[in-house]
Structures are given as structure tokens and as C-alpha cells.
Swiss-Prot record:
This is Vegetative protein 16.
């Protein structure tokens, strides 16, 4: 959630 990666933000958020 605190990652800058688009995959992490899009996926987790």
C-alpha cells in the first residue's frame, strides 16, 4: 500500500 509501484497501488488500493 505504501509502495510506489503501480501494480501494488492498483492492486492493493
Amino acid at each position: 500500500m505504501d509502495t510506489i509501484e503501480p501494480v501494488s497501488v492498483a492492486x492493493i488500493s
